[in-house]
């Protein structure tokens, strides 16, 4: 009971403010900076805050975490920088042209893509932003090539010659413009949401879009406005950042900025704008302090990931309507349907199944004896990535959760397994199992803080894990517990007797491992564990009413996913007979996830189709930007046209063949009423 004159303190807000204070205190105590560099970090933190507030604005309007926020401003920034640096345009003219382009880009993205998913689960819209991210990254890389130049790390000169020397640090007009513009833009957004009638309408439509539409609020137009504002904020942050540290291009530039913005969102529980801005500025100062006090800037990534994990551990769970609304899962309508019992018992259908299985086995087993060596190796890689795809089917297709750092778990499993077999001479099969266990342990450690809360926290934390693993944990600059990229190791014989040192033998071994992983995953799906995971995905509250622990079910799915990912990574590392961290980057996690969506997350066979798509694109399209275009466009087309992925095409073909075999007419559309027979008049 509240005492008179005493206000209740929101524990969530108190935790967020304490986290911001702890970040600032950590920077001041352990990562001290000269005052000039502290001002430099404050300016960069302000620009990161603009990016984070733009993400929070979209989240407040759509309840969607926009992973394309950093890339919305990439293409306009590239154009503006090219206009100024290559064509000699004045600073203000180039900035204005880029600003107009960013607004147009935000409108086009919302109107042409996001609006098409307005009736889809929010998780599906979040996946769509991943496809948009890949498209925009590719466009940002291609733009400078139209001029035949390279924009990487080019700095835009300030429009005036103002300078301020603080110690040994020189701050120019770019710093002053960036600081003033970032503060004004965040203040403008706060005023817009609190005082402007459109801002109030945006807040109302975010809470209950259907009710807002019934009251005459133009929800679609407001969403377009929000995306245009967010794109403009992204552009302003990246353009002003270009004058300080260089033009950002590609994943390497956009992902660290996105990590800071996401960390700020996690601290603020995704929507408190003042806390988002304060956390982003504090993280910018912390990053500057880490960069100054360490030999490499990569040390900042594990620290930011640790901050996110600690904040998630101390945050309280909530069952309020707002937090319940943020919970969303992958669509379950496109799961593979088993054949009807009468069809399975039909002799001709059973003969057809036996024929298809026999022909498939003959082709797969006989392929290495007729293919060239390079094709045998490439097909073995497909088998390894198919196991990784199975891990995403379990996590996203069954549990309805997203992992954007799956390749980090794959890499850890690969590193542990390669270390066991190359240094400790462990049996290859045992090494694969150890790699799988390592992946499961990592998944458990990450899932405990992330899966306690409803929403997309697992996607955010695994994204942080991916960057921290790529830049720090699996970097030979910091650790040497795993084989370095230059070290080639031999595959040990199976059980000390059966050699798998040739491409054909390793192909057959990889095929066997894939078959066992497929059988194990299928068995889990048919068990009570699989049914519980599906039940929690479909209706978490209803499952909890039957005494099903929802968090434990989701954590189980993530651990199973981690084990499969670790086994796939171990298999891939021994295929290459070397370990290179570049094969397990965060960009690779994006590609693997989108390929799994293209293959189909509703079926185990979709994992194989997604792996074939991913590796096939890289065989025929060696250029990275065109690979990103094909992957981004592919996932958007699948979400729009074929929600079940390529795997659903096989199910359609299966149903047609079965119908022809049993000589049954097509099933009528249940939405179309059947004609009522009318008796002729006497």
Task: Spell out what each predicted region is.
Residues 262-269, 278-312:
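Hydrophobic alpha-helical segments
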Residues 64-67, 102, 184, 208:
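Glycine-rich phosphate-binding loops of nucleotide-dependent enzymes
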Residues 192-200, 204-208, 524-530, 536:
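Transmembrane helix boundary and interhelical loop/hinge segments in multi-pass membrane proteins
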Residues 16-27, 80-81, 99-105, 132-141, ...:
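Hydrophobic core segments of alpha-helical transmembrane domains in multi-pass membrane transport
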Residues 115-119, 201-214, 264, 291, ...:
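Short amphipathic alpha-helical coupling elements at transmembrane boundaries
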Residues 56-65, 235-252, 263-266, 566-581:
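Non-cytoplasmic
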Residues 4-5, 32-33, 39-40, 44-47, ...:
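Transmembrane alpha-helices and adjacent helix-loop boundaries
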Residues 19-33, 55, 75-85, 235-239, ...:
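Membrane-embedded alpha-helical segments in integral membrane proteins
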């Amino acid at each position: 009971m509240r005492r008179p004159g005493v206000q209740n303190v929101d524990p969530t807000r108190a935790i967020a403010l304490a986290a911001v204070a702890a970040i600032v205190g950590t920077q001041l105590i352990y990562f001290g900076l000269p005052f000039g560099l502290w001002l430099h970090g404050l300016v960069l933190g302000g620009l990161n805050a603009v990016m984070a507030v733009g993400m929070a604005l979209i989240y407040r309007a759509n309840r969607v975490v926009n992973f394309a926020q950093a890339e919305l401003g990439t293409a306009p920034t590239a154009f503006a920088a090219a206009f100024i640096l290559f064509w000699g345009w004045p600073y203000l003219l180039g900035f204005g042209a880029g600003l107009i382009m960013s607004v147009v880009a935000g409108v086009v993205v919302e109107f042409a893509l996001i609006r098409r998913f307005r009736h889809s689960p929010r998780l599906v819209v979040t996946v769509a932003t991943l496809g948009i991210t890949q498209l925009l990254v590719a466009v940002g890389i291609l733009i400078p090539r139209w001029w035949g130049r390279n924009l990487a790390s080019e700095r835009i000169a300030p429009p005036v010659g103002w300078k301020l020397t603080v110690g040994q640090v020189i701050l120019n007009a770019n710093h002053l413009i960036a600081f003033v513009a970032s503060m004004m833009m965040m203040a403008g957004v706060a005023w817009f949401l609190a005082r402007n009638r459109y801002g109030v309408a945006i807040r109302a439509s975010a809470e209950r879009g259907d009710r807002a539409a019934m009251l005459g609020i133009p929800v679609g137009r407001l969403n377009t406005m929000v995306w245009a504002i967010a794109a403009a904020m992204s552009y302003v942050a990246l353009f002003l950042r270009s004058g300080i540290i260089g033009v950002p291009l590609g994943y390497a530039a956009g992902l660290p900025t996105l990590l800071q913005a996401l960390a700020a969102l996690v601290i603020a529980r995704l929507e408190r704008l003042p806390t988002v801005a304060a956390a982003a500025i504090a993280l910018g100062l912390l990053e500057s302090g880490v960069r100054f006090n360490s030999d490499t800037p990569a040390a900042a990534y594990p620290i930011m990931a640790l901050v996110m994990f600690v904040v998630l551990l101390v945050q309280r769970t909530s069952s309020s309507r707002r937090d319940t609304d943020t919970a969303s899962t992958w669509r379950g309508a496109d799961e593979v349907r088993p054949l009807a019992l009468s069809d399975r018992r039909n002799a001709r259908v059973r003969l057809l199944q036996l024929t298809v299985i026999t022909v498939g086995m003959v082709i797969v087993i006989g392929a290495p004896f007729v293919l060239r060596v390079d094709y045998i190796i490439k097909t073995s890689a497909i088998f390894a990535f198919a196991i990784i795809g199975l891990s995403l089917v379990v996590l996203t297709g069954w549990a309805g959760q997203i992992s954007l750092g799956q390749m980090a778990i794959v890499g850890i499993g690969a590193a542990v397994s390669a270390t066991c077999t190359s240094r400790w001479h462990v049996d290859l099969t045992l090494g694969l199992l150890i790699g799988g266990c390592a992946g499961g342990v990592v998944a458990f450690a990450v899932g405990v803080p992330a899966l306690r809360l409803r929403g997309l926290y697992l996607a955010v934390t695994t994204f942080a894990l991916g960057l921290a693993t790529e830049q720090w944990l699996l970097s030979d600059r910091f650790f040497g517990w795993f084989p370095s990229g230059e070290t080639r190791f031999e595959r040990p014989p199976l059980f000390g007797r059966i050699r798998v040192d040739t491409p054909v033998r390793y192909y057959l071994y990889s095929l066997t491992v894939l078959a066992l992983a497929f059988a194990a995953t299928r068995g889990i799906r048919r068990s009570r564990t699989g049914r519980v995971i599906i039940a929690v995905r479909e209706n978490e509250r209803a499952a909890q009413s039957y005494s099903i622990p929802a968090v434990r079910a989701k954590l189980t799915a993530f651990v199973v996913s981690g084990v499969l990912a670790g086994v796939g990574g171990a298999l891939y590392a021994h295929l290459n007979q070397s370990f290179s961290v570049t094969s397990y980057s965060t960009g690779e996690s994006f590609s693997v996830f989108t390929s799994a969506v293209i293959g189909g997350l509703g079926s185990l066979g979709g994992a194989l189709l997604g792996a074939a798509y991913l590796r096939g694109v890289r065989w025929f399209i060696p250029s990275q930007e065109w690979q990103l275009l094909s992957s981004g466009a592919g996932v958007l087309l699948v979400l729009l046209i074929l929600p079940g992925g390529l795997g659903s095409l096989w199910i359609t073909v299966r149903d047609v063949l079965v119908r022809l075999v049993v000589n049954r007419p097509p099933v009528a559309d249940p939405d179309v009423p059947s004609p009522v027979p009318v008796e002729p008049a006497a």
